[in-house]
C-alpha cells in the first residue's frame, strides 16, 4: 500500500556568510523555518531489495536523484548497523511543487523525507541523530529537515540549535530562473566576512541575506521580483535564491498582495511553521 509523506519547503529568514574554510566551504549563520507547503512523496514498500523512482525528474538521472541516493544510503547505513530487514525496497513517486534552484530546499527536503519515511516503513530503528548524520553526507541542509524543528544553523549549516521564531504568513515568489548554489558562493563579490553574532542578538536585528546583493546583481529576474515585493512588505531572498519572500501578520494580507502578482511570477502563500509537517506526520 502506498503511503504519502510531506516534503516541506524551508525559508532562510536570515543568512549571513561569516567566512570561508580552507576546503572552500563557507561558514554561515542562518535561521531555518519550515513552510506548510511543499512536495509530496509516495512510497510503496517492496520485498525484493529494489529502489524504483516512478516519477523521474527531467534533466536528472535517476541514480543522481537525491531521492534515490537517500534510499540507497539508508539501505547501506541500516545494513552496516545490522538493522535492514531482508528484501527492503521501495517504489517511490513525487508530486513536485517546489522549484529546482529556488532556495526552498526542495532536494534536501526530499532526501530527508525519504530517510525518515523508509526508516519507519522498513522498521530500521535508526535514531534521529543517526538519520541526521547520514543525511549530512547528502547535503548540508538535509539534517534540519530530518530533525524537523526550526533552527539556528552555524558552521557550514550542520550545527543546529532549535529555536521558535514567530510563525508569520509568507508570500513566496519564484521569478522563473534557477540559481545553482555554486554560482552564488563562487562569486568574487559575495560578502564573506560578516561578523558572527549570538542568536539572541540576531533575533533583535533586522533580518538580511548576504547572498541577496549578488543574486539581484547577476539575475535581473530576482531584482525585479524583489523590487515588486518590497512595495508591499519587508522582503528578501531565501537561501541563494532564486525565490524571494515577503512576510505578513495575516493570511488575508498575504493573499491580497498575491492577487496583484504579475503574471511572470509563480507565487504562493504559506504559513511559517516551527514544527515540520513531516514531523507532524510522524506523531
UniProtKB/Swiss-Prot annotation:
GO terms for biological process: isopentenyl diphosphate biosynthetic process, methylerythritol 4-phosphate pathway; terpenoid biosynthetic process. InterPro entries: GHMP_kinase_C_dom (IPR013750), GHMP_kinase_C_sf (IPR036554), GHMP_kinase_N_dom (IPR006204), IspE (IPR004424), Ribosomal_Su5_D2-typ_SF (IPR020568), Ribsml_uS5_D2-typ_fold_subgr (IPR014721). It catalyses: 4-CDP-2-C-methyl-D-erythritol + ATP = 4-CDP-2-C-methyl-D-erythritol 2-phosphate + ADP + H(+). Coiled coil: none annotated. The keyword ATP-binding applies. It comes from the Bacteria. Its EC number is 2.7.1.148. Keywords: ATP-binding, Isoprene biosynthesis, Kinase, Nucleotide-binding, Transferase. Pathway: Isoprenoid biosynthesis; isopentenyl diphosphate biosynthesis via DXP pathway; isopentenyl diphosphate from 1-deoxy-D-xylulose 5-phosphate: step 3/6. It holds the Pfam family GHMP_kinases_C. The keyword Kinase applies. ATP binds at residues 99-109. GO terms for molecular function: 4-(cytidine 5'-diphospho)-2-C-methyl-D-erythritol kinase activity; ATP binding. The active site is at 10, 141. PANTHER family: 4-DIPHOSPHOCYTIDYL-2-C-METHYL-D-ERYTHRITOL KINASE, CHLOROPLASTIC. Homodimer. HAMAP family: IspE (MF_00061). Belongs to the GHMP kinase family. IspE subfamily. Catalyzes the phosphorylation of the position 2 hydroxy group of 4-diphosphocytidyl-2C-methyl-D-erythritol. NCBIfam families: ispE. This is 4-diphosphocytidyl-2-C-methyl-D-erythritol kinase. It comes from Citrobacter koseri (strain ATCC BAA-895 / CDC 4225-83 / SGSC4696). The lineage of its organism: Bacteria, Pseudomonadati, Pseudomonadota, Gammaproteobacteria, Enterobacterales.
